[in-house]
Amino acid sequence: GKYDNGRGSARLSVFNFSHEIKSGRTSSVAHHILGFDSEGKIVNNDLMKMDWTDIVKASSKIISFFDLAGHEKYLKTTIMGLSSSIPDICFITIGANMGITKMTKEHIFLCVMLNIPFCLIVTKIDITKDRKNVIDETLSEIKILLKMPGIRRVAYKINNSEDVLLCSKNNNTNSIIPMFFCSNVTGEGIDHVKQFLNL
């Protein structure tokens, strides 16, 4: 894939409508696929433009992604996307600079209510590098939220490949929630997400 420029350039390939590009917010359900070959390498990336037929032919494993809206205004669209696609897992993104928001809680509760396993991806760690307390505070908020009645999950911060393997093995229990800390600008942590997807 390609890294972001820090101003949202990478997400332009995900948006369906011009108003999404202007606002920077997903308002619809976008569907994309990612292919892995037999060696675990990603088949389709931004350097090679491939259509879905070519991706499927070249892949030994296909992952379907449904990008859903995160904004409160489009919650009904998100609920429809989650309940109709019946995903194997849901990735909930949290901006390290924003922390837990009302919608983060809503999305976690939706996954719990629909019995969908989920992971948390804390993004934008590049802009909080010099403020370790911000990331620590976000991590603390996540742990508190996941311990709430009705959720009762354990957050597990992914630090290395062994952590990825451990969380992948225990993912079907729904009790351990993997947390990936990533930067879409520097690429830090992205390899752990790719490894998790390919297991």
Language-model segments: which ranges?
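P-loop NTPase switch module centered on the Walker A-proximal segment
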Residues: 1-73, 85
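Conserved, well-folded catalytic cores of nucleic-acid-processing
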Residues: 2, 37, 81-85, 110, ...
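Eukaryotic intrinsically disordered and solvent-exposed regulatory patches
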Residues: 18-20, 51, 77, 164-168, ...
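Single, functionally critical "micro-switch" positions that shape active/binding sites
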Residues: 23, 122, 182
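Short beta-strand segments at enzyme active-site cores
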Residues: 30, 119-122, 155
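Beta-strand elements of modular eukaryotic interaction domains
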Residues: 53-55, 81, 109-110, 170
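Conserved Switch II/interswitch segment of TRAFAC-class P-loop GTPases
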Residues: 60-64, 68-76, 84-108, 112-136
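Canonical P-loop GTPase G-domain recognition
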Residues: 127-199
